[in-house]
Amino acid sequence: SSLSGTETGFNIQINLSSDVLFDFDKAELKPEADADLQKAADIIRQKGQGVILITGHTDSKGSDAYNQRLSLARAQAVKNWFEAKGLQQNYQLEGLGATRPIAPNTHPDGSDNPEGRAQNRRVEIIVNKTTQLGN
């Protein structure tokens, strides 16, 4: 599975690989995205309270403005998929483009790092387990 997650006392962060969810440069979900999205939906259904934050992320290829739009469109596509499956929640969407990399887009010598860029192309879902943080 291309889905990974971490859980704290307050929330669960789910990471989904954009390469599994979307074709290159597209914001339409691929059919093979269903399995990972279903797992994420199950977590939201079981644990979700309050706001569900969906953020899209890209690698560093392309302009900042373009990547921001693409990442937001991808977050919207994931939200639409959840809602089509009857998962009505208070969703908050963000398109962060290439501003929050989790891996280097280039090697130390400045050459391209395809593996790092692949990790950065992702959709993150933050599932709040409590309606108010700090409770």
Where are these regions (language model features)?
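Periplasmic peptidoglycan-binding/tethering modules of Gram-negative envelope proteins
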Residues: S1-V51, K129-N135
